């Protein structure tokens, strides 16, 4: 497998295997990793992960597990056995849930995926949190959940780039994965707390998840190359 040389993760947000692989075939695994989310995984199951790995890609399995500790830990174990590079769980599942996942991965003798916690979804603003009983700013909730994640031994966090600087300051050992990345001139779509790729790295993000600006471009390879050039 070719080691990726950039922090870019391209989101394969498609409903079918054929559509996802059509995009993957236009991308260079040395220039990006790929993310498999709920829609594609539900459609294709584990087979899509194996196919992408065979093409040389490191795979971020973005299923955001959230259940009782044992159930979530077993799901993370199954993801590791697929050979994924990164897997995530919701920090709001609590300390015991995250710690159970860490413990399960630490039992493995082979390669371990990065275990990443999801803090506050980048589509959520203060009024969204208020609707679920949290009358606080998203950034405050992110910091609360980050402290739990570090205590549980997580490798990193999914967070908005707008929270990255504060998180790196408070938790420098955690790797930060940032969705909602939009190259200059791109539409915001349904993401709200967003920055450009360069702004996100400068803020402290370690990995950048980019979807539609690459996946819906007329020339995805050219769009990817443009982002790589922006980061050079």
Swiss-Prot record:
EC number: 4.1.1.23
Example of a GO biological process term: 'de novo' pyrimidine nucleobase biosynthetic process
Gene Ontology MF annotations: orotidine-5'-phosphate decarboxylase activity
Active site: 64
Stored InterPro entries: Aldolase_TIM, OMPdecase, OMPdecase_AS, OMPdecase_bac, OMPdeCOase_dom, RibuloseP-bd_barrel
Gene3D superfamilies recorded: Aldolase class I
GO cellular component, as recorded: cytosol
The entry's keywords: Decarboxylase, Lyase, Pyrimidine biosynthesis
Residues at which substrate binds: 13, 35, 62-71, 122, 182, 191, 211-212
Domain of life: Bacteria
Catalytic activity: orotidine 5'-phosphate + H(+) = UMP + CO2
Associated pathway: Pyrimidine metabolism; UMP biosynthesis via de novo pathway; UMP from orotate: step 2/2
Family that this chain belongs to: Belongs to the OMP decarboxylase family. Type 1 subfamily.
NCBIfam families documented for this protein: PRK00230.1, pyrF
Function: Catalyzes the decarboxylation of orotidine 5'-monophosphate (OMP) to uridine 5'-monophosphate (UMP).
Subunit structure: Homodimer.
Protein name (Swiss-Prot/TrEMBL): Orotidine 5'-phosphate decarboxylase
Organism of provenance: Pseudomonas fluorescens (strain Pf0-1)
